[in-house]
């Protein structure tokens, strides 16, 4: 679970893409590539020592779970506004906090499905 995201919004990097020369074609490519946001449903500790908690990160949500949901939902809205398919998945891993071992077990089928 990422601690914060670079949103496709007009806010400064690293939390947004303000003043970056991103064409509509490049944006469509980014949103059409197969991808996944995988979140542990228990990754909700706002005081986790490895969680970024500056103003920009906190504006995305109080914890990794909230931030991931908001990032995914925002990208769905952008794809809809561009009238294009969105190929990302949102997968919530039950009973997982910020734990690599539980996340990789859930990620393996997605990562290997095209082999």
Where are these regions (language model features)?
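The feature captures the conserved acid-bearing segment of alpha/beta-hydrolase catalytic domains
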Residues: 1-77
């Amino acid at each position: 679970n990422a601690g914060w995201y670079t949103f496709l919004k007009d806010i400064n990097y690293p939390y947004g893409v303000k003043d970056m020369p991103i064409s509509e074609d490049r944006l469509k490519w980014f949103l059409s590539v197969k991808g996944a946001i995988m979140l542990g449903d228990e990754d909700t500790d706002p005081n986790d020592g490895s969680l970024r908690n500056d103003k920009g990160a906190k504006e995305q949500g109080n914890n990794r779970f909230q931030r991931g949901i908001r990032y995914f939902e925002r990208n769905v809205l952008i794809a809809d506004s561009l009238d294009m398919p969105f190929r990302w998945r949102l997968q919530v891993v039950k009973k997982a906090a910020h734990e690599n071992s539980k996340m990789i077990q859930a990620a393996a089928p997605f990562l290997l499905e095209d082999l």
